[in-house]
C-alpha cells in the first residue's frame, strides 16, 4: 500500500449489521465500494485455524463456523456483562460471551488457541476493514475519521466507540449522531434552502433505532430533541420470524433445533432474506435442505404473517416519535418533512404506521437509507479536515444535544440531574451539593446517565472521590460539581470544595466498559500483530498456490514424451529431486511464503537450465 498519508478524513457509519464508508473532497461525496463492489460491508468478524476474515468473507462462512463468527458487537460495546439486554442477546448468539471483571468479551478459537476480545477490539477490526476499503480507493494511508453512533448511545458507548477507532489506528476527529449525519445528507442533497424547516429523522437500522427532530435553516442544523432504543432493529424482526420458524419446524418434525448453532445460522440467514423479499412481495418461501437431523424445512411466509409477528415491535417505534415531538414542544402538523433512514425503513408496514401517525403525510425517501449516515459523516470529516470547498458546507453548523440527562447520586440514591436531556453540546453545567454528616471529610460522587429518579434504574458511568475536605458541620461545605460535555458527547466531571479549593475530577474513562490508555495501546499493538498474521497468511496462501501451479506444469513437462525430449541429458533426475523437495515443503503446515517461493525459484532455475537449447 502507498505510504503517502491522505490529508483528509473519511466518514464511517459503523453499523450493527452493516457498515459503510465515504469520502468528501471538493464538492462531491463518494460512497466507497468494497472489493465485491458493494457499498455496505457486513459488520462480521470470523476467526479460523489459519486466518481472520472481516466483512463479506466472514458473513459468507458464518453457517460453517458459527461459534467463531462475531456479529452484533454494537449491542455489546460500552455495556456491562450483567446488562439485561446482553443476557437476552446471549441466548440467541452462537458465539460465546464471557465475563471479564464486569466487562463482556467474546471468546473464540483462533490460530489453534483460545482468544478473548473486547467489543472495542472487534469493532476496531470492522473499522480497520472500512479504513482499508477507503485506502484502496484513495491509494493513500488513512489516519483520520469521523465515526457515527446512535443518538441514544450513552457516554460509555460513545467513549468505547472512540477507543475502537484508536485501536484501528484512526484519529477520531469527531463522534457524530447517526440521525444528525443523515440530516446533513438530506439537507445538502435536497438543495440548501434558507427557509426554516422542521425535519424528523426516523432512523431504523439493523440493531438500533433513533428519532431526531432537527430545525434546519440555511447551513445551521439544530437538534431540538432526540429519542430512541439502542436495542431495536432489523435483527429483532429476523429473530421474531426465526422463533416462529423454529416452532413450525418442531411442530412438523417433532425435533428441536435450538441447540444446533449451524442450523440456527442457516435459518437466520433465510429469515433475513425472507424479510427483505417481503418488503416488495406479498409472500415468500423459506426452503432449507437438511436443516437439522436430515430434515428439510419448507414454509410459506406471507407479508401479513411477518407483520403480525412483529406488530408489537413495529408499533413500539412510534413511542420515541411522540416523545421527540413532546420534548421539542411542537405539534405533528408543524413537522415539514419526515426522512427515512436505515435499511429497516424499507418495510412497508413501518412506512404505513409512520405516515398514519402524521395523519397520512408523505414520507421523504429521496436519500439512500443505507448510505445517508456515511454520507453525512464524510461531509463532517471533509469540513473538519479542510477538504470541503463547496459553498454548501462553508457555513454548515451542527448543534446536537445530550440524549439522556447526566447527574450524580444524592443521599438515598436519588438521581440529581446536572445536565438535562436535550441540552445542546458542547456545554458546561454546574450544581452545588453539600455534606450529610458532621465532620465528613470524604465525599463520593457516583455519576449516572438516565431519566429515572432511582439511580439504580439509570446507567452508572463512573465514580470519583473528593477528599480530604475540611471537617465542618453537615450542610456547611459548598461542593461545586461541574459537568463538561464535549462535541463528541463525552463527559468530564469536576468537583471542588469551595473553602479549601480542593478538587477532584473524572473523565469518565475508568468505569466498567471503558479502557485505560495502557489497555488501548496494548490493543493497538495486538491489532497490528493480527494484521501482520493476516498478511503473512495471505502471502503464504498465494505462494502456496503459485508453487502448486508450477509443480503441475513441471509434472506435465516431464511426463510428456515430446516435451521431456527437450530436457538436457541428466537434468531430469535433478528436476524430479527438486520436485520432491518442493512437494515436501508444501506438506509443512507452517511453511513461510519465503520458503515456498525459494522452492519455486530453485525449480524454475533447474527447468530453465534443462530446457536451454543444447
UniProtKB/Swiss-Prot annotation:
Functionally, this protein is described as follows:
Ribosome-bound, Hsp70-type chaperone that assists in the cotranslational folding of newly synthesized proteins in the cytosol. Stimulates folding by interacting with nascent chains, binding to short, largely hydrophobic sequences exposed by unfolded proteins, thereby stabilizing longer, more slowly translated, and aggregation-prone nascent polypeptides and domains that cannot fold stably until fully synthesized. The Hsp70-protein substrate interaction depends on ATP-binding and on allosteric regulation between the NBD and the SBD.
Q: Which cysteines are joined by disulfide bonds?
A: none
- Gene3D superfamilies cross-referenced by the UniProt entry: 1.20.1270.10, 3.30.30.30, 3.30.420.40, Actin, Chain A, domain 4, Substrate Binding Domain Of DNAk, Chain A, domain 1
Spell out the subcellular localization from the entry: Cytoplasm
Region (Substrate binding domain (SBD)): which ranges?
404-614
Q: Which superkingdom does the taxonomy of this entry point to?
A: Eukaryota
What does the record give as the reaction this protein catalyses?
Answer: ATP + H2O = ADP + phosphate + H(+)
Keyword check for Magnesium, yes or no. no
Q: What is its EC number?
A: 3.6.4.10
Report the protein name in the record. Ribosome-associated molecular chaperone SSB1
Return the annotated region ranges for Nucleotide binding domain (NBD).
1-392
SUPFAM superfamilies per the UniProt record, alphabetical: Actin-like ATPase domain, Heat shock protein 70kD (HSP70), C-terminal subdomain, Heat shock protein 70kD (HSP70), peptide-binding domain
